[in-house]
Each structure stands twice: as structure tokens, then as C-alpha cells.
């Protein structure tokens, strides 16, 4: 082929060569493309963005974040002392030492699960600062192709935040785990189902947490107004819940600064009351730090002691919200505030209540308020209600964020998502979901009336999510982290065994109330699974029926096809090839806009994508047709822009593409820069994709692996003798004028107007498919689609500029 060696000394001391794009048959040893107008040009230009280095966080900022996260993260876990003892001893305290056994279980369960597992292990398994089971799944998705949607592209790995590290790939167990996840479809499906089960439990928890927290806090009124009936307490709680959910539409931006001081006062209060009760009633409860009392507790109570674990585990509720909201804070700030703020206060509260109950075991049903000194009752009551509302707010916000993330995976029907803060993109409000959560919380409160039964339902959500988190963390340790297999085994055995014991305890009491979160979670899982299943099937159908290249060329060259002024943005899910709805449009309306852009909105398994790396383009066939394919890439936390802002950004990046694609073209032959080592890695990516996804990548879209041109420019700018060899020879005035004319033509057509073309596919089950498939597609999915938001509303597209093209798919 006659490669010309132009220079050595890139950042990896790799050989840089100039490659002629020629037929594959002549050079089988070099991964090359048939077309230069590929998505590669923009991907490499964008991929040159610098990583945000791991800058050391100052202690001033750490302390500030530590203070702020007290209000956001610890409302739920900090209000657990309101109901733990009453949920543990449902039938009263049978033996005084049972309190020591329960306290010992609380201390060591709290330490094991919240401190060891979540604060010092799980927080490190974050996805670029984002936490939660969903983030664990996306972290795994970046290191192994586990997505059920076959839309992976090699260009995605060029994004600066798409950092897989890959030094651990040399480990045999990492390769084994990667191979297992990518080649075994059953494993992919189970991993997906576990993830959506965990997210369904988190959403269900957003119903139960407000119910149990507010009911526990309001229940304290009985101490000062004993004539209040249970029903009256319930209706006061319902009224409080309605107000709580009603104010969600306003967001917490304006009052959020009050959360941290309120929760901090709450923690100081319960800690001080705990010290007071311990000194006044029984300092002997400190013996509970001896593990012997746990053994004695189970010996004495046997089966009843095992069942009581469903109440004990409520002491670490809120840990998943803590993990999920990691994105707003740093790991060090959470570890600092948790270790020196939350842990002492909460443990002192539990110790103090145990000391009080040693003398007043008959007050077990309302331990918290009975153990509070009379002079402190009203301040405690006010802070308890405020803290329970703040803790509930954290879970509601967590549910909104979870559903927003699920939509990016196409696992949830389209719902309206509003951003309640211009400053903080993570503050969301979803009207439909908010209404359903409010109705659910009110019905649970009215139906169960007591915190004991709601606590049993709450417990199953907590333990299910913890077990799934343990499984996902184990995969992360094997696939991503470079830790000893013995540490992985120790982690899995310790946490899976202990959490399974807690799970068995809550499942034993399934009929008492646990069916509520299970029923809600099963319902949500059915909705999410059906939605995702049909989306995957539709994508596979379109991928199998993409319009062949010669057919596209034939359509574009037809003389009866009229080119009308303006720009057409043709939205499609496909990132590869032309969708089958395009020729259907031409048959019905034999005209094409002067500039036609096939736009694919693609969400990547990373939290965010820099704006400079969002768009990648390629020409569809000849340049003079002015038909492009564009992929707009977003992270799962990135909000969608308004239509006008999106078009402006697309136009700007299209101008860059036109400039770059001509800059990379030098004369009659086409050349691009290529890094030899990087070439092999991208070639491997394509081979792996074809092998494991079962879908071939079309030849005209295969990308020539290369380094970012912008990075090479930086490297070579200080080396004049080498830089002269890289100068593009034919970028003369005539070439520059051609580029400017093409750019101006695009701008003129943009001024003529933009039309958004949406393919409205009517999905029906194939007549030869199974009965289950017909029920899923023709009934469940059809119902969900008819009752969710339209595509143009989700994309914020003006209705006056929308053109819908209907087509039927049989799957």
C-alpha cells in the first residue's frame, strides 16, 4: 500500500502514518473504510477533549459539601429512630436483655451495611460521580456490551468521559466476566431484570417512606392530645402528605438551603436526648457492644428473634438514597459527614431509647416521644415533622431521577419531565408520577394506619435493593476493579449471606403487608419490561430492514423527486443505516428538503456528554445531495434542549463537520491520520460488536480508527520540521471557497425553515407469533403508548413544524 511514515512521538510514542483509503481487497491487514464521509471525522475531533483530571478537592469545599449533604442525604436514615423499636418488638418486650440483643443488632447491622458496605465500598463504585443501582448497571455497560439494544458504536469510546480504563482487561477473570456478559443473552436479560427490579423497589420506596416517616412524626400528637383517635392521626398525616406532594412542582431550590440546618439540629437533638436517657436510666446498655448479646437474643427468642429482623433492618433505611444522590456531592464529604455527624447521633439515639425501655418496656409502641423529656416535646415534634418531610423529599426526588434515567434506557413510557431549577439540572418534577406517588402514599396510610405494618412493607424494599446492589457490586469488582479474588469472595459471602437472612425474615411476613411493595414493583417491572422489549424488537426490525445503499442512491437521483426549500430533520432510532420509513415517505410525498438530516437521539451509559462532543455526522452518498446522518449523544443525566437550541447546536456542529471533512480530504486521494495501536483496538471493538450483538455493521459506516486531529495539532505545533509534513496540500483558496459556499447554503436553508419529520410506527404482533407476544404487543404496549406523551412533546418540537409519517411494523 505504500504507507508514508510521517513522524514518531505521539503521546504514547506510537507510529503515526498517513493512510490512503483504498479497496479492502488490496490491503487486508489495515482496517480501512470505503467512504471518507464517515462519522469518524467528528468523533475524533470531539474525542480530543481533555479529561477532567482528578483534581484534589480542597478541605474548605469538602466541609461545605459535608454540611450540605446532611440535609439532602440523611433525612430518611436520620428519622429511623422514630419507628425501629416499635417495629422490632411488635408484641412487646419479653425479657429485659432482649433490648440489649436488639440494640447490639442495630449497632452492628448499621455499621456493617451503612458504614462498611455503602459509605466505604459502594460509594467508590460510582459512575463518574453518579451512584445507585442504575449507575452500577451503566458502569458495567461501559466495560461490557450488556445492552439489549444493538446500537453500540466504536465512536462512543472516543468520548472523553467514556473512560473504561482497561488495564484490568489483562486479568483472566475480567476477560472471563466480560465474555460471559457479552455472549450469554440469558445473563444480559437477568442483569437487566435485576436492575429494573431494584429501580422499581426504589420507586415503591418513594410511596412508603413518606407514609411511614410522616405518620411516625405526626403520631407524637397523641402524647399531648390523648383524645385523638387513630383515624384522626391518619387523616392529619394524609393532609400533610397531600401538601408535601403538592409543593413538588415548585422544587426545593428556594428552600433547599434550610434542609441542612434542620437535619443538623435534628441529629444534635436526638443525640443529646440519647445521652440524657442513657445517663438517667441505664448506662448498662453500653454492654450491647458485646456481640454475646446477639447470640443470647437468638437463643432466647429463636424463631421470634429471626422474625424481628424485619424491624431491625429499618435502622439502615435510606442508604440507597444516599448512594443514588452521590452525584451532587463528593465521596470524601459524605464519608466525613456520615462518620462524624450521622453515626454518633443516630447510635446515641438508639442507645438512649434502649436505656429508657429498660425501665419502661410498656412504652415500646411510642418509644421515641415517650423517651423525650417533656420540656423538649414541642421542639422535638416540630423538628421530627420537618425531618420526616425532608427525608421523604429525598426519596421522592430519587424516584423522579430514577424514572428520568429509565427513560434514557427506553425502559419507561414517555412522561413529562420538568426541571425545577435552572442552577441544578438534577432537580426534577414529573407531574404524572408525582400524582401516582401521592395517591399511593395516602392509600397506604389509610389502609394500614400504623407504622408497624407499613414498616414491614418498607423493609422488603430496603433488603431487595441491598441484595441487588451486592450482586452488581460483585460484578464491578470482577470486571472493573483490580482487587484480589479473595476480597471479592469475602465481600460476596459476608453481605449476601447476611442480607439473605434479613430477606428471609421479611418474606416470612409477606401476608402482613409486604405484598404492597411487591405488587407495586411487579406492576412497574411489567410496564418497564414490556416497554423495553417492544423498543428492542422495533429497533431490530428497523435494523434488519434498513434501506440498502443503492436504493438510497436511486431515491435521491429520481427525477420526479422535488427538492423543496428548507431543512428536514428526520428523526430515527437507528444510528446505522437509513430507516425503512424513508422510502415510505417518498412514495407518499415525492419530495425531499434541500437539506435532509437523519437525526438519531442516542443516550450513552455515562452520566453526561460534553456539548463539544455531542454531535457526529456523515454524508449519505454524494456530497451534492446534501443528505446527512447525525447522531446526537447524551448522557443519562443530560436534559434535552428546546427545539430551537437543539437546531442551533446541530447547525453549528454541522458547519464544523463540513469544514473538517474537507480539511481531511487532500486532493484526489483521501487521507486521514491513523494511530496504529488505536486502530487495532477499534477494529476489535467492531469485531466484538458483530460477534456478540448478532448484527453486522454496514460497510459504508465502518470507521477508520485514528487519533484526534486536534490532539495531533497540539503535539506537532511545537515541532516545525514535522508539522510541515502534516500540512494539507490542496487547501487552496478554491477549496476554501467551496467550503464556505457549502456552509452558507446550509445556513440559507436553515433560514427557509426547519421541518421535523417523525416516523410514527404502528407496532403490531406478527400473526405467526406466540400468544404471549400478541398480548404484550397488541394490548399492554398499545395501551401504554396511547396513554403516554407524544414524541414531539418529549423533544419540545413546535406542533406547527411537525410532519408525521405512519408505517406499520410486525414484530
Swiss-Prot record:
It is a multi-pass membrane protein. The chain crosses the membrane at residues 65-85, 103-123, 189-209, 227-247, 255-275, 311-331, 336-356, 376-396, 435-455, 460-480, 483-503, 516-536. It is found in: Membrane. It holds the Pfam family K_trans. Residues 1-64, 124-188, 248-254, 332-335, 397-434, 481-482, 537-811 are cytoplasmic. InterPro entries: K+_transporter, K_trans_C, K_trans_N. GO terms for biological process: potassium ion transport. Residues 86-102, 210-226, 276-310, 357-375, 456-459, 504-515 are extracellular. Its main location: membrane. Keywords: Ion transport, Membrane, Potassium, Potassium transport, Transmembrane, Transmembrane helix, Transport. GO terms for molecular function: potassium ion transmembrane transporter activity. GO terms for cellular component: membrane. PANTHER family: OSMOTIC STRESS POTASSIUM TRANSPORTER (PTHR30540), POTASSIUM TRANSPORTER 27 (PTHR30540:SF112). NCBIfam families: kup. High-affinity potassium transporter. Belongs to the HAK/KUP transporter (TC 2.A.72.3) family. This is Potassium transporter 27. It comes from Oryza sativa subsp. japonica (Rice). The lineage of its organism: Eukaryota, Viridiplantae, Streptophyta, Embryophyta, Tracheophyta. The gene is HAK27.
Amino acid at each position: 500500500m505504500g504507507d508514508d511514515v510521517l513522524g514518531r512521538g505521539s503521546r504514547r510514542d506510537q507510529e503515526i502514518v498517513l493512510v490512503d483509503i483504498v479497496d479492502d481487497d488490496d490491503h487486508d491487514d489495515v482496517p480501512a473504510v470505503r467512504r471518507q464521509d464517515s462519522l469518524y471525522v467528528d468523533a475524533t475531533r470531539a474525542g480530543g477533549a481533555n479529561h477532567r483530571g482528578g483534581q484534589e478537592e480542597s478541605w474548605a469545599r469538602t466541609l461545605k459539601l459535608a454540611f450540605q449533604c446532611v440535609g439532602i442525604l440523611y433525612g430518611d436514615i436520620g428519622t429511623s429512630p422514630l419507628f425501629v423499636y416499635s417495629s422490632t418488638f411488635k408484641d412487646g418486650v419479653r425479657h429485659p436483655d432482649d433490648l440489649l440483643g436488639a440494640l447490639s443488632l442495630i449497632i452492628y447491622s448499621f455499621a456493617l451495611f451503612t458504614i462498611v458496605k455503602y459509605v466505604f465500598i459502594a460509594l467508590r463504585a460510582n459512575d463518574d460521580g453518579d451512584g445507585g443501582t442504575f449507575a452500577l448497571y451503566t458502569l458495567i455497560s461501559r466495560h461490557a456490551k450488556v445492552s439489549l439494544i444493538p446500537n453500540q458504536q466504536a465512536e462512543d469510546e472516543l468520548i472523553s468521559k467514556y473512560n473504561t480504563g482497561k488495564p484490568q482487561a489483562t486479568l483472566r477473570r475480567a476477560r472471563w466476566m466480560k465474555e460471559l456478559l457479552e455472549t450469554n443473552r440469558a445473563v444480559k436479560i437477568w442483569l437487566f431484570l435485576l436492575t429494573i427490579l431494584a429501580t422499581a423497589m426504589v420507586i415503591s420506596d418513594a410511596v412508603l417512606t413518606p407514609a411511614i416517616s410522616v405518620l411516625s412524626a405526626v403520631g407524637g400528637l397523641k402524647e399531648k392530645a390523648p383524645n385523638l383517635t387513630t383515624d384522626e392521626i391518619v387523616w392529619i398525616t394524609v393532609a400533610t402528605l397531600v401538601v408535601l406532594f403538592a409543593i413538588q412542582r415548585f422544587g426545593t431550590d428556594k428552600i433547599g438551603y434550610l434542609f441542612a440546618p434542620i437535619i443538623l439540629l435534628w441529629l444534635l437533638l436526638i443525640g443529646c436526648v440519647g445521652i440524657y436517657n442513657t445517663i438517667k436510666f441505664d448506662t448498662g446498655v453500653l454492654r450491647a457492644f458485646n456481640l454475646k448479646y446477639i447470640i443470647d437474643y437468638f437463643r432466647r427468642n429463636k424463631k421470634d428473634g429471626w422474625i424481628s429482623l424485619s424491624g431491625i433492618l429499618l435502622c439502615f433505611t435510606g442508604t440507597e438514597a444516599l448512594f443514588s444522590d452521590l452525584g451532587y456531592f463528593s465521596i470524601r464529604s459524605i464519608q466525613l459527614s456520615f462518620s462524624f455527624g450521622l453515626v454518633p447521633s443516630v447510635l446515641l439515639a438508639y442507645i438512649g431509647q434502649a436505656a429508657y425501655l429498660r425501665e419502661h418496656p410498656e412504652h415500646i409502641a411510642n418509644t421515641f416521644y415517650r423517651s423525650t423529656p417533656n420540656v423538649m416535646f414541642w421542639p422535638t415534634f416540630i423538628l421530627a415533622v420537618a425531618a420526616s418531610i425532608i427525608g421523604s423529599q429525598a426519596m421522592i426526588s430519587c424516584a423522579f431521577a430514577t424514572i428520568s434515567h429509565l427513560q434514557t434506557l427506553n425502559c419507561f413510557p414517555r412522561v413529562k419531565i420538568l426541571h425545577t431549577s435552572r442552577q441544578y439540572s438534577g432537580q426534577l418534577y414529573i407531574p404524572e408520577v408525582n400524582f401516582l406517588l401521592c395517591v399511593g402514599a395516602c392509600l397506604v396510610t389509610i389502609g394500614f394506619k400504623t407504622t408497624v405494618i407499613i414498616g414491614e412493607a418498607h423493609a422488603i424494599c430496603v433488603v431487595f435493593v441491598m441484595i441487588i446492589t451486592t450482586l452488581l457490586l460483585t460484578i464491578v469488582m470482577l470486571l472493573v476493579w483490580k482487587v484480589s479474588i479473595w476480597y471479592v469472595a469475602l465481600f460476596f459471602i459476608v453481605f449476601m449471606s447476611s442480607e439473605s437472612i434479613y430477606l428471609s425474615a421479611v418474606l416470612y411476613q409477606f401476608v402482613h403487608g409486604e405484598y404492597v411493595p411487591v405488587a407495586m414493583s411487579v406492576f412497574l417491572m411489567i410496564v418497564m419490561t414490556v416497554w423495553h422489549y417492544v423498543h428492542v424488537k422495533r429497533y431490530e426490525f428497523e435494523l434488519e430492514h434498513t434501506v440498502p445503499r443503492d436504493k438510497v442512491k436511486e431515491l435521491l437521483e429520481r427525477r420526479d423527486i422535488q427538492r423543496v426549500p428548507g431543512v428536514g430533520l428526520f428523526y430515527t432510532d437507528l444510528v446505522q443505516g437509513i430507516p425503512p420509513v424513508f422510502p415510505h415517505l417518498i412514495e407518499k410525498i415525492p419530495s425531499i428538503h434541500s437539506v435532509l438530516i437523519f437525526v438519531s437521539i442516542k443516550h450513552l451509559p455515562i452520566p453526561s456528554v460534553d456539548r463539544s462532543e455531542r454531535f457526529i455526522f456523515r454524508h449519505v452518498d454524494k456530497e451534492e445531495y446534501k443528505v446527512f446522518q447525525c447522531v446526537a449523544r447524551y448522557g443519562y443525566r443530560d436534559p434535552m434542549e428546546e427545539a430551537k437550541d437543539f437546531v442551533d447546536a446541530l447547525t453549528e456542529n454541522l458547519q464544523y463537520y463540513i469544514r473538517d471533512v474537507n480539511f481531511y480530504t487532500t486532493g484526489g486521494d483521501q487521507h486521514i491520520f491513523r494511530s496504529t495501536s488505536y486502530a487495532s483496538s477499534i477494529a476489535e471493538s467492531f469485531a466484538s460488536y458483530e460477534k456478540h450483538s448478532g448484527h453486522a455493521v454496514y460497510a459504508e459506516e465502518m470507521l477508520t480508527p485514528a487519533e484526534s486531529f486536534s490532539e495531533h495539532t497540539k503535539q506537532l505545533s511545537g515541532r516545525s520540521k514535522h508539522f510541515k509534513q502534516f500540512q494539507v496540500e490542496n487547501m487552496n483558496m478554491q477549496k476554501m471557497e467551496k467550503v464556505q459556499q457549502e456552509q452558507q447554503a446550509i445556513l440559507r436553508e436553515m433560514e427557509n425553515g426547519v421541518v421535523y419529520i417523525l416516523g410514527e410506527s404502528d407496532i403490531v404482533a406478527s400473526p405467526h407469533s406466540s400468544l404471549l407476544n400478541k398480548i404484550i404487543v397488541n394490548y399492554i404496549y398499545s395501551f401504554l403508548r396511547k396513554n403516554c406523551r407524544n414524541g414531539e412533546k418529549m423533544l419540545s418540537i413546535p406542533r406547527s413544524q411537525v410532519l408525521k409519517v405512519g408505517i406499520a411494523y410486525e414484530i
